[in-house]
Amino acid sequence: MIVGTGVDIVDIARFERQLERTPRLRERLFVPHERELAPRSLAARFAVKEAAAKALLAPPGMIWQDCWVSNDEHGAPHLHTTGTVARQQRARGVDTWHVSISHDGGMAVAFVVAEAQEGSRDD
């Protein structure tokens, strides 16, 4: 059962300028292994985080580092959660994430589907 969906689009050049103007932003938004990525990839990962927050109904007090993206051996993105995001994920019964990322025309877009098994929600 689909619990929530989220989509977000990020202007890559604008995001890169924000990272340059605010050096601590990289540390606030990303876990250590994400911080080393190119701005294009960081913009896409931030879009995933925003889309996941929308799919979970933006948990109050969400800490951006409590969700991160990794890629499997085929390059497919996977969303991981801990802390504030994982608590909201459990409360909503989400046990599977579906993530799609694309880049084109200077933009990065992410679409996230939060899925739960029937009857697994806490409400």
From Swiss-Prot:
Its cofactor is Mg(2+). It is found in: Cytoplasm. GO terms for cellular component: cytoplasm. The keyword Lipid biosynthesis applies. Keywords: Cytoplasm, Fatty acid biosynthesis, Fatty acid metabolism, Lipid biosynthesis, Lipid metabolism, Magnesium, Metal-binding, Transferase. It catalyses: apo-[ACP] + CoA = holo-[ACP] + adenosine 3',5'-bisphosphate + H(+). GO terms for molecular function: holo-[acyl-carrier-protein] synthase activity; magnesium ion binding. InterPro entries: 4-PPantetheinyl_Trfase_dom, 4-PPantetheinyl_Trfase_dom_sf, ACPS, Ppantetheine-prot_Trfase_dom. Its EC number is 2.7.8.7. The keyword Lipid metabolism applies. One of its GO terms (biological process) is fatty acid biosynthetic process. It is an enzyme of class 2 (transferase). Mg(2+) binds at residues 8, 50. It holds the Pfam family ACPS. Belongs to the P-Pant transferase superfamily. AcpS family. Transfers the 4'-phosphopantetheine moiety from coenzyme A to a Ser of acyl-carrier-protein. This is Holo-[acyl-carrier-protein] synthase. The gene is acpS.
